[in-house]
């Protein structure tokens, strides 16, 4: 239980943690394996959207699984390794900025999740997707869970894998395009990123030129210290 910031000392905020209840019920219904799916990178101005699909081992679930946005960088990195070492199957997929521009971010996110699921080494009987939409074309039954990364441990694991992989990809972009600071803001619309775009222009095939800032000439700036709360 976490204390909420308030003028009243008696006000508390209960922070719900994801559990394995959705997966356990599916197992009881004969729907196993169950995969969790999530993506990272819907909001940035640059870089890919990355998705992951994870089938956890019910007998070996890493402690501390949570929505990746509620974890620190170091917590995500540690859990990433534990997930890879304990899960029954893990798969990742990405859609490039060009692919996003060629459709839209929602379609690209759903397609990345579908590709990640198809890439699993086991064939799940049920896929749990974070959000409101089930990706079309899944090879199994699918269920969308709003705030699923805060409700299902399988989805939480997928959110961590997707976030860590995307951050690593953006750090690689930063080493190739050192004037933009991708390794700091991960492609989000921070003041530093906006200034770099205004000074040097967008990077071909890396910036999402279909996004409003490039079409309309402006966007809300995201402060770099707030990036921990973004996917």
Curated annotation (Swiss-Prot):
<dbReference type="InterPro" id="IPR022898">
    <property type="entry name" value="RNase_HII"/>
</dbReference>
<keyword id="KW-0479">Metal-binding</keyword>
<dbReference type="InterPro" id="IPR024567">
    <property type="entry name" value="RNase_HII/HIII_dom"/>
</dbReference>
<dbReference type="GO" id="GO:0043137">
    <property type="term" value="P:DNA replication, removal of RNA primer"/>
</dbReference>
<dbReference type="GO" id="GO:0003723">
    <property type="term" value="F:RNA binding"/>
</dbReference>
<keyword id="KW-0963">Cytoplasm</keyword>
<dbReference type="GO" id="GO:0032299">
    <property type="term" value="C:ribonuclease H2 complex"/>
</dbReference>
<keyword id="KW-0378">Hydrolase</keyword>
<dbReference type="GO" id="GO:0030145">
    <property type="term" value="F:manganese ion binding"/>
</dbReference>
<feature type="binding site">
    <location>
        <position position="130"/>
    </location>
    <ligand>
        <name>a divalent metal cation</name>
    </ligand>
</feature>
<dbReference type="InterPro" id="IPR012337">
    <property type="entry name" value="RNaseH-like_sf"/>
</dbReference>
<dbReference type="GO" id="GO:0005737">
    <property type="term" value="C:cytoplasm"/>
</dbReference>
<dbReference type="GO" id="GO:0004523">
    <property type="term" value="F:RNA-DNA hybrid ribonuclease activity"/>
</dbReference>
<keyword id="KW-0464">Manganese</keyword>
<feature type="domain" description="RNase H type-2">
    <location>
        <begin position="32"/>
        <end position="223"/>
    </location>
</feature>
<comment type="function">
    <text>Endonuclease that specifically degrades the RNA of RNA-DNA hybrids.</text>
</comment>
<comment type="similarity">
    <text>Belongs to the RNase HII family.</text>
</comment>
<dbReference type="GO" id="GO:0006298">
    <property type="term" value="P:mismatch repair"/>
</dbReference>
<dbReference type="InterPro" id="IPR001352">
    <property type="entry name" value="RNase_HII/HIII"/>
</dbReference>
<keyword id="KW-0255">Endonuclease</keyword>
<dbReference type="InterPro" id="IPR036397">
    <property type="entry name" value="RNaseH_sf"/>
</dbReference>
<protein>
    <recommendedName>
        <fullName>Ribonuclease HII</fullName>
        <ecNumber>3.1.26.4</ecNumber>
    </recommendedName>
</protein>
<feature type="binding site">
    <location>
        <position position="39"/>
    </location>
    <ligand>
        <name>a divalent metal cation</name>
    </ligand>
</feature>
<dbReference type="Pfam" id="PF01351">
    <property type="entry name" value="RNase_HII"/>
</dbReference>
<keyword id="KW-0540">Nuclease</keyword>
<feature type="binding site">
    <location>
        <position position="38"/>
    </location>
    <ligand>
        <name>a divalent metal cation</name>
    </ligand>
</feature>
